[in-house]
A protein has these predicted regions:
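C-terminal and inter-domain tail/linker signature
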Residues: 1-286
Length: 286
């Protein structure tokens, strides 16, 4: 059984979604396999894109014959088989979810109001040079956040600050360089959930494969909604945040990071009005 991101409950619903599209093309990006057994299983993961033209009605969404790009992460590990599909370009263009595009968020490479989702290929070739120590040091750095300063995490020690690509959900953007990542995602995310604790996540797995690596958390962390996020005021709720990460590393620096966040379910978990709105549009129950 595959565990899908919102709103797909099973293979049948997943396949019905794609039956509403034509000119479907899958583009593989990276495949990662653990180099050791994890709980008696070799774990594997991949990130890929599907581009397709929306030509038939899906739920209450009418076809527009536009072509959309979906970034998809997949993990098959000791916790099960999981697929996390970013729907936020498709939803944003149909006025179904918030996304960063106002003048306040303006940035030429990530949050341009005219932007569309693009495929990002690895900028680092695969090699056998193990990236585990650098990856794990970066994760430990994230856990050092003091609640005040991004510098407390020392991310500049782990990332190539100029060549870095953080390829997130369309709603957030493709962020280039450490400064853009901090300005347009990390600072906003930590204002949103300053008490986030990744060590308490469930179904967690992280592994490297040479200079490539992958992580999954389902959910990835425990946290409290304490700051405004995408216009949603804090209600002290416990957000559901399902995450997959895929990395490349060049020497001792991380470079590419495809980050899957189930943004629609995250929004649902922090705002009852949005949950009722999107569930109605998608005929979703449960």
């Amino acid at each position: 059984m595959i565990n899908y991101s919102y709103p797909f409950k099973n293979d049948k619903e997943w396949n019905k979604f794609w039956a509403c599209f034509d000119d479907i093309k899958e583009t593989g990006i990276i495949d990662v396999k653990s180099n050791a057994l994890i709980n008696n299983k070799f774990c594997k993961a991949r990130v890929y894109y599907i581009t397709a033209k929306f030509t038939r009605k899906w739920k209450k969404i009418k076809p527009d014959n536009d072509t959309y790009t979906f970034q998809i992460g997949e993990h098959d590990n000791t916790n099960g088989h999981f697929i996390n599909c970013d729907l936020t370009e498709f939803f944003a263009m149909n006025n179904l979810c918030p996304w960063q595009h106002s003048s306040y968020w303006a940035s030429s490479s990530s949050v341009d109001s005219e932007r569309r989702k693009e495929i990002h290929y690895p900028t680092v070739e695969k090699s056998d040079v193990d990236c585990w120590s650098n990856l794990w040091n970066m994760v430990k750095g994230l856990r050092m956040y003091d609640g005040k300063s991004l510098e407390s995490m020392n991310m500049k020690d782990h990332w190539d600050v100029k060549k870095m690509h953080w390829v997130g959900p369309f709603a957030i953007g493709h962020l280039k360089g450490l400064k853009e990542f901090e300005d347009y995602h990390q600072s906003k995310f930590l204002d949103f959930i300053p008490d986030r604790d990744g060590s308490t996540g469930q179904n967690k797995v992280i592994f490297s494969d040479g200079n490539y690596a992958a992580l999954m958390g389902h959910p990835s962390m425990t946290c409290t909604h304490k700051g405004e996020y995408f216009g949603f005021k804090p209600e002290k709720k416990q957000p559901r945040i399902y995450v997959m990460d895929f990395w490349t590393c060049d020497g001792d620096k991380l470079i590419d990071n495809w980050c899957q966040i189930d943004m629609i379910d995250l929004f649902r978990s922090i705002n009852k009005e949005y949950e009722e709105f999107i569930d109605d549009k998608l005929h979703y129950t449960g």
